[in-house]
């Protein structure tokens, strides 16, 4: 329901031609393996992948954060209880953010939304490495509630604006979900090594710096708007 508020362009009425033109249009709009593979030839696809490589670090950050947070309290029981409160508050704020994010993205644009989410993510990680005490760490973790809704909504809208709309679900699964999982799997052992060797705070500083670097570079790589003329030829459906 939230994503339906995204106004990504005018909806075109289906073309109906004599002699079963509507069936021909449906046939032509089907996605083939060749259509999906053609994404690999698009520079803007790899630009999106580059951004995702940096943004998916937040999953690795969240994996061991409970251990770091609980360690800030005198007892494990007290720390675990406080983390439960933290997690509950964060979930409610994220839900509220999902209602506000489409309104924001429709005004600042999908690219700016992605950059904003990436920068907030970097600030959150770097802040977790700089601040001390459970209260400040509690606050830095809550920033995630402002970051995640903007990231998700911006990603959906960016994909819809800049790629063949027939491939939007494929792009989201491969370009965002799958890539995040694969990169997270590769980064997790490195993060674990950092936790054991130099500690949580220095590792968070490194992770935040990586996110900042990839997000800053993405300012020049991501496309500012949806240019339909730049879509691959396969997105053009001609009905005789």
Language model regions located:
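A membrane-interface helix-boundary motif in multi-pass transporters
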Residues: 190-211
């Amino acid at each position: 329901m939230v994503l339906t508020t995204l106004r990504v362009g005018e909806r075109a009425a289906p073309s109906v031609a004599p002699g079963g033109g509507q069936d021909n249009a449906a046939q032509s709009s089907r996605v083939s393996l060749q259509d999906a593979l053609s994404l690999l030839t698009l520079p803007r696809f790899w630009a999106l992948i580059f951004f995702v490589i940096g943004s998916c670090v937040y999953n690795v950050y969240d994996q061991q954060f409970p251990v770091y947070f609980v360690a800030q309290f005198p007892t494990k029981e007290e720390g675990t209880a406080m983390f439960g409160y933290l997690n509950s508050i964060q979930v409610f704020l994220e839900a509220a953010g999902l209602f506000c994010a489409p309104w924001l993205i429709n005004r600042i644009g999908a690219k700016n939304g992605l950059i904003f989410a990436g920068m907030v993510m970097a600030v959150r990680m770097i802040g977790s490495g700089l601040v001390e005490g459970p209260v400040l760490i509690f606050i830095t973790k809550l920033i995630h509630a402002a970051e995640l809704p903007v990231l998700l909504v911006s990603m959906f809208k960016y994909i819809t604006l800049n790629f063949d709309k027939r491939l939007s679900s494929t792009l989201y699964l491969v370009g965002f979900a799958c890539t995040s999982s694969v990169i997270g799997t590769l980064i997790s052992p490195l993060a674990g090594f950092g936790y054991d060797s130099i500690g949580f705070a220095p590792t968070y500083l490194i992770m935040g710096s990586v996110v900042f670097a990839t997000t800053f570079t993405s300012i020049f790589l991501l496309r500012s708007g949806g240019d339909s003329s730049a879509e691959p030829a396969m997105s053009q459906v001609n009905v005789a």
